[in-house]
Swiss-Prot record:
Keywords, alphabetical: Cytoplasm, Hydrolase, Nucleotide metabolism
Reaction catalyzed: a ribonucleoside 5'-triphosphate + H2O = a ribonucleoside 5'-phosphate + diphosphate + H(+); a 2'-deoxyribonucleoside 5'-triphosphate + H2O = a 2'-deoxyribonucleoside 5'-phosphate + diphosphate + H(+)
Signal peptide: none
Pfam families for the chain: Maf (PF02545)
Localization annotation: Cytoplasm
Cofactor(s), by name: a divalent metal cation
Organism the protein comes from: Rickettsia conorii (strain ATCC VR-613 / Malish 7)
Protein name as it appears in the record: Nucleoside triphosphate pyrophosphatase
Length: 215
């Protein structure tokens, strides 16, 4: 009689509250959260999509090289861009303001590079995906821009805005995955996990029990 194998433990290579929340939405609770400390500086003339997938891979492979146990590592990197121009992860009030001014009344793209590595018996199996979402902000007044900047929610966010926060009120158009904008495209994440043999019955609508990865 064939026995069902236990899921490998999930390691999330990020301390992002949004990514943790998104995994919880699909009833997946990581066994460990290990942020990957890498240099996220774009290479010369590097475009947004290649940057996002490169950084996601570097995060995942770094954690895979650090652990000894078998596990599935989930890593992601989100990049906001207007055309080919990569917007920074804003770290100051002025950077947030500059980003919001640039996004006002324009379409921009959110790219999330997803890399999931299954490490088992020192063998690595890699799944990678780049997901793009198009977002358009309404034309913002100076008052709206200044108010948003005063909230500080755009600090440390790609493009200087938190789409799941107050900035959601600025969106006049969105095309593509909303969870991608938040930092982890759930459809692609579930597909990649499934292809690596990770089973979670709670992903199915009829099942509501949480699926903890094995410890």
């Amino acid at each position: 009689m064939k026995q069902n194998r236990k899921n490998l433990p999930i390691i999330l290579a990020s301390s992002s509250p949004a990514r943790i929340e998104l995994l919880n939405r699909i009833k997946i609770i990581p066994s460990q959260i290990i942020p990957a400390d890498i240099d996220e500086t774009p290479n010369l003339r590097e475009l947004p999509a290649p940057l996002a997938i490169r950084l996601a891979y570097e995060k995942a492979i770094k954690i895979a090289s650090q652990i000894e146990e078998s596990a599935i590592i989930i890593a992601a990197n989100t990049v906001a861009a207007v055309g080919r121009r990569i917007l920074p992860k804003a770290t100051t009030y002025e950077e947030v303001k500059n980003c919001i001014k640039m996004l006002s009344g324009r379409r921009h793209r959110i790219y999330t590079g997803l890399c999931i590595i299954k490490k088992e018996n020192d063998q690595l199996t890699v799944r990678q995906k780049i997901v793009q979402t198009i977002v358009k902000f309404k034309k913002l007044s100076d008052e709206e821009i200044n108010f948003y900047c005063s909230l500080d929610e755009g600090i440390d966010k790609a493009g200087g805005c938190k789409i799941s926060g107050y900035a959601e009120a600025f969106i006049s158009f969105i095309s593509g995955s909303y969870s991608n904008v938040m930092g982890l495209p759930l459809f692609e994440t579930v597909n990649a996990l499934t292809s690596l043999g990770f089973r979670c019955s709670s992903i199915m609508p009829a099942k509501m029990n949480y699926c903890h990865s094995a410890t």
